[in-house]
Amino acid sequence: MHGRPSRPLASSSSSSSSRVFSFFLAPRVFLFLVVVVVVVFLPGRSSCWWLEGTEELEEEMGFAGDCSPVSGGGLSENGKFSYGYASAPGKRASMEDFYETRIDGVDGETIGLFGVFDGHGGARAAEYVKQHLFSNLIKHPKFISDIKSAIAETYNHTDSEFLKAESSHTRDAGSTASTAILVGDRLLVANVGDSRAVVCRGGDAIAVSRDHKPDQSDERQRIEDAGGFVMWAGTWRVGGVLAVSRAFGDKLLKQYVVADPEIKEEIVDSSLEFLILASDGLWDVVSNKEAVDMVRPIQDPEQAAKRLLQEAYQRGSADNITVVIVRFLEGTTTGGGPSREAASDQNS
């Protein structure tokens, strides 16, 4: 009676223990799986969000693995300018920023073509503009003789062609376009949306584009004159939907959200040091003056672009981040001191 329990009793005890074990373990296994799914597939966060605050961010660029920015650069054959770029999804799970850096020859003239394209509603519009805008521009019959007209017409033509290509899509997509065209000693900056162009001239940080926002008085008036409206929905939005007042695409709002670029021209002389083109992933957290001060001592434009990208990421930018820098080499000054904020700079 007091010997070893019979085998069935041992089996019964084991079965009872298993049931107790399962009772406590199963919910924990389920909870663990839920946590894994939530962490891995958490919407709105990049696959690299977990690097924040860890020692990996102390590396030279503050990124690791899939978080490393795409970067590169080059030098024009005539030696008059160099360029660099850096681009990364940042804290976003998807990438909707695109960029273009291109050196071409037209009628014996060396042409520099640089652009940043920040998509919304997906990447389709930004990718299309990257692939077609500059190709359309250099084929324009007035490209050399009347370059400003050529730029304006090409922006609108490319927008129209994209909208035709979008006819089968039910979801709207759009894109900003901040571009710089370098022809001889002329720098022409054309902008649609809220990507921004800033130059450093003689130490001054000067915005050479305007962020197109629907709460600007002239933009709001244009939208309302066209039959649209602007309302507050977290920020001022066209039709309560779109936070920029000009863009490529956005076919459902096209009557109000135009692709007419604002174009500014700068003369390339010894006082013009460099140009920064960037998406709002940079400008949301770094002022024009701060960006110029960071770039000015760095002669390699690729390293300068990576420096700005790193700074925006570490300051908590919630968006994709793309930076293109063009440094003008002929007769430029290369001071390393802090820049002066120009009076005309309204976007700092």
Curated annotation (Swiss-Prot):
Subcellular location: Membrane
Positions contributing to Mn(2+) 2 binding: 118, 280, 319
Membrane disposition: Single-pass membrane protein
Catalytic reaction(s) noted: O-phospho-L-seryl-[protein] + H2O = L-seryl-[protein] + phosphate; O-phospho-L-threonyl-[protein] + H2O = L-threonyl-[protein] + phosphate
Residues reported to bind Mn(2+) 1: 118-119
Keywords attached to this entry: Hydrolase, Magnesium, Manganese, Membrane, Metal-binding, Protein phosphatase, Transmembrane, Transmembrane helix
EC class (word): hydrolase
TM helices/strands, residue ranges: 23-43
Cofactor note: Binds 2 magnesium or manganese ions per subunit.
EC nos: 3.1.3.16
UniProt GO molecular function: metal ion binding; protein serine/threonine phosphatase activity
Cofactor needs: Mg(2+); Mn(2+)
One GO-annotated biological process of the protein: regulation of intracellular signal transduction
Keyword set includes Manganese: yes
Cellular component terms per the entry's GO annotation: membrane
Classification via SUPFAM superfamilies: PP2C-like
InterPro entries (alphabetical): PP2C, PP2C_BS, PPM-type-like_dom_sf, PPM-type_phosphatase-like_dom
Domain called PPM-type phosphatase: residue spans: 82-328
The family this protein is said to belong to: Belongs to the PP2C family.
Protein name: Probable protein phosphatase 2C 10
Organism: Oryza sativa subsp. japonica
